[in-house]
Each structure stands twice: as structure tokens, then as C-alpha cells.
Amino acid sequence: MTTNYIFVTGGVVSSLGKGIAAASLAAILEARGLNVTIMKLDPYINVDPGTMSPTQHGEVFVTEDGAETDLDLGHYERFIRTKMTRRNNFTTGRIYSEVLRKERRGDYLGATIQVIPHITNAIKERIIEGGEGHDVVLVEIGGTVGDIESLPFLEAIRQMAVDVGREHTLYMHLTLVPYLAAAGEVKTKPTQHSVKELLSIGIQPDVLICRSDRAVPANERAKIALFCNVPEKAVISLKDVDSIYKIPGLLKSQGLDDYICKRFSLTCPEANLAEWEQVLYEESNPGGEVTIGMIGKYVELPDAYKSVIEALKHGGLKNRLTVNIKLIDSQDVETRGEEMLKGLDAILIPGGFGYRGVEGKVLAARYAREHNIPYLGICLGMQVALMEFARNVAGMENANSTEFVPDCKYPVVALITEWRDEDGNVEVRTEESDLGGTMRVGGQQCHLTEGSLVRQMYGEPTIVERHRHRYEVNNMLLKQIEAAGLRVAGRSADNKLVEIIELPNHPWFVACQFHPEFTSTPRDGHPLFAGFVKAAGEYQKRQVK
């Protein structure tokens, strides 16, 4: 099988939407029956985004095989059926660390290590490895053309045309075409200069995607084609839209997929976008709306919760409801109390690390429990729900997590190495013991309890969901909590770790240790989010009555 490569770069400014554009094009090519995947190459020096601040970088997207990756991989999985893996994302930091490790081992036989060829060769090897077995691989280069950090990546993709053949490579450049109100027209000069910058590196773009707040007129597209040496039919206008799921249709309507298939000499049927048309129909024809409060600590940057926000919208699609998401700082809940939570149809507490704002989340979980408001807790959201229930229902005063209070009397959440039984004996771990409690990352099996609400929603006894956490429910204190009325609705494959809890005497109170948002898609949704949004709609109806 010959793999074809589409390299996606951005110019003029950052945040133009390269990831969405690449994912949308991939969706069209997939709809034509092609086997497609997408890669993201990040120029920053961090080895991966796992330890980066969510308020700077946005969320960390976790793949099925346990890689901590860029949030763009979430967009990729929401647009195409191919599951991302650790092969689909790498950084400058990872490339340099691998090259330096080889140098220390003597693999280069004493050669002087340089950006060209050693770093660029390592990048190319990764790209080829990630594209194995696919008809088309789209490779998004992070950052903007002209950034110092991205130069090795741009040089590597320039060399790819030589290595695999120009007939199997295509360069797609996203650029800004701003509209100047004073002049009453769009301006093409920034695009011309961006392409000039790309040409200076040795890359002639084959396709230009022109981002603007309005459709770029045909005469301006012709001008861009002339000055940038690109066929007019390969200059694509991509205007701002109210739904990202309209973009596949926009690109297809301008013949981008036909142009690419001809360029690669691919024979395949026309794209059938019926599934995307159904998504748009559901989105534009809601039967009502609900307001869901998300209580978090990184709310100043919504991208920190990108997958959760999208999953809530998907839940709305499955229920024909518009979901209005109210982002609430958990510290504000601590200081201002329940007034921050009034008027909500449901409450969601997502994952997070660190003590800041935790007591606000505990208060929100209590408010949802006591007022019969639908509640969904994810990761830390499950842990604070457990802490709240232990304190206020199970009689465990000041119950906490050892992440926040290491010497608390009732550590209902702890590392496995900190679990103590009634006699004070520490849980013993061996090399064969479960790895939970260090950092569980990636897809894990979960057995659902017969008769539970979540078993009913999933419709199957065993599921696989993705984790990213260190702390677990403390089994040593679980009996007392269960006796007070809490149900364990899901356990790990070996039945040792609590994965899901729910309250049988509450209309809809579910919390999970895993991250269901990472497997939600607009076409399929996710059982937990669909059930949660449905419960929000039912709560709203009860309040009206």
C-alpha cells in the first residue's frame, strides 16, 4: 500500500483552526471510503503536554493506548472513526530526547549530531511510522510558519516530498484573509507574505485554505491564486460558521476532496455526508434547552475542558436539546455559596488536580444531592462526591483525599500504598499488584453492576473507558459508605478498584473515575452524557410543574 501525505501548515496568525480544517478534510476523505488518519506535530520543547498547565495549553487528550496528547487529537477522533494512538502526536522535546538517548548509547558512531540530518530524519521516521497502513495521512504542523520552533518540522516535511515522491505529498496552507471595514474589502497581502515565507523554506503550497469572517469573493481567490502560484480551484474559502460540523460540507462544496483525490490518483466513490447532515439537522432543530453548570478551577480557558464541553453538546444532540453550559469557578462557590448554583438544570464536576477550589466542588456535589439535581462527576468529580457523601451521610467527619490532607482521619480517596485496614495495616503491593494509584492512563475495562443505572444506560455488562489519575477510592472504608446508601456501579477488570458510583435514591446521580468525554462523538454521542442531558431536561420539567 502506498501512503499519501497531506501536510497542513498555518500562517499569518495562530489559532486559525488547522486542527478543525484537517479533521474536516479527513472526514470527507473517510466518507469516500479511504483509510485516513491524522497526526499532530507540536514544536514545543515539552516531551508531552501531560505536565503543562491547562490554562496555557488547554486539556490533555488521552488516547486508548494511554498517550497524553494535544487537544487537537480530540477533534480528530470526533470527526473520523480512526482511533488515535501515541503514534499520532509527538513534540520537539520527544524527538530531541530520543536522538540524545541514541547519541549517549553510541548509535551514531561518534558522528556530530545536527538538526539536519539527525533531527529531521527522526521526524520523518515518526511520520512514516504513523502513516503505515493508511491511504492518506494528514500531518498538522503546530504553530505558525515563521516561528523558530517549527523550522525543523518544516524542513522535514520539505524532505518528505523527495523521500516518498512529490506525487504522494500535498502541502495545504491555512492563512488569514482579514476583512477591513474601513476599506470595505478583504485583504490578500498577509496571505501572499505567508506563502512567500513558506517558499523561502522550500515548500510550494498546493492548496490554500483562506480563513475569513465571510466568504472570500471569487475575484480575490483568483488574485491569491495568481500571486501564490496555486491553481484557482485549490484556493478554498473557509468562512466563520456557527457550527464546526458544517465545515466538511463547506470544503466538499468547493471540490477540495475531488482535487486531492485527482492529485493522488485515487479512485474512490463520492463522499456520502449523510451522517454529518443528520448531526446538523439535530443541532439546528432542538426541542428545548437546558442549562448545565460546570464547576471547575480552569474555567478562564474553556479549552481546558474542550472534550467535556463537546460531549455535553453531543448529549444534547441525542436528546434534541440545546445545552447551555455555565462555567463556574469552584473558588467562587467556596466564597459565595449556593447562590452560584441556583437556576441550573444539572451540575457537572470535571477532572482536575490540586486542592484549590476543592471545597467548592464538595459544596456543589452536596447541593446536587440534597436538591435532587442531576449530577455527573468525572475523575476528581467522583472523588469529591464520595468525600461529600462520606462526611454528610456516612458519618465520616472531615473525610478527605490524601492528595489534599495526607493525614486525615478518613482518607476515602488515596493512593493504594496509603490504604489502611481497620487494624491500621498498610495495603501491601508486590510486582504483580494492580498498577492503579500511580498514574492510570488509557483504556481500561470496567464491569458494570447488574441492576445499576449505568448498566441500563450502557446496555452491556463490560465497557472500556479512558483514565488519567493517580488516586483511587479507598476500599478499606468502602463498606461503611455503601451501608449509608451509596452504590458501587462499576469496578475494574479485577474487581479491586471502584470505577463508578451512583445514588439509588436520587433521580440521577452518577460519578465515574474515568473520562467518558474522550470517547464521545457527534455522530454516536456517549451513554453517560446522553443520559445526563436527558435527566437535566426531566428535572427542568419537574421544576416547571
Swiss-Prot record:
It is an enzyme of class 6 (ligase). GO terms for molecular function: ATP binding; CTP synthase activity; glutaminase activity; identical protein binding; metal ion binding. Its EC number is 6.3.4.2. It catalyses: UTP + L-glutamine + ATP + H2O = CTP + L-glutamate + ADP + phosphate + 2 H(+); L-glutamine + H2O = L-glutamate + NH4(+); UTP + NH4(+) + ATP = CTP + ADP + phosphate + 2 H(+). The active site is at C379 (nucleophile), H515, E517. GO terms for biological process: 'de novo' CTP biosynthetic process; pyrimidine nucleobase biosynthetic process. It comes from the Bacteria. ATP binds at S15, L16, G17, K18, G19, I20, D72, K239, D240, V241. GO terms for cellular component: cytosol. Residues 291-542 form the Glutamine amidotransferase type-1 domain. CTP binds at S14, D147, I148, E149, K187, T188, K189, P190, T191, Q192, K223. Allosterically activated by GTP, when glutamine is the substrate; GTP has no effect on the reaction when ammonia is the substrate. The allosteric effector GTP functions by stabilizing the protein conformation that binds the tetrahedral intermediate(s) formed during glutamine hydrolysis. Inhibited by the product CTP, via allosteric rather than competitive inhibition. SUPFAM superfamilies: Class I glutamine amidotransferase-like, P-loop containing nucleoside triphosphate hydrolases. Pathway: Pyrimidine metabolism; CTP biosynthesis via de novo pathway; CTP from UDP: step 2/2. Residues 1-266 are annotated as: Amidoligase domain. Keywords: ATP-binding, Glutamine amidotransferase, Ligase, Magnesium, Metal-binding, Nucleotide-binding, Pyrimidine biosynthesis. L-glutamine binds at G352, L380, G381, M382, Q383, E403, R470. Mg(2+) binds at D72, E140. Disulfide bonds: none annotated. PANTHER family: CTP SYNTHASE, CTP SYNTHASE-RELATED. Catalyzes the ATP-dependent amination of UTP to CTP with either L-glutamine or ammonia as the source of nitrogen. Regulates intracellular CTP levels through interactions with the four ribonucleotide triphosphates. Homotetramer. Belongs to the CTP synthase family. CTPSs have evolved a hybrid strategy for distinguishing between UTP and CTP. The overlapping regions of the product feedback inhibitory and substrate sites recognize a common feature in both compounds, the triphosphate moiety. To differentiate isosteric substrate and product pyrimidine rings, an additional pocket far from the expected kinase/ligase catalytic site, specifically recognizes the cytosine and ribose portions of the product inhibitor. This is CTP synthase. It comes from Yersinia enterocolitica serotype O:8 / biotype 1B (strain NCTC 13174 / 8081). The gene is pyrG.
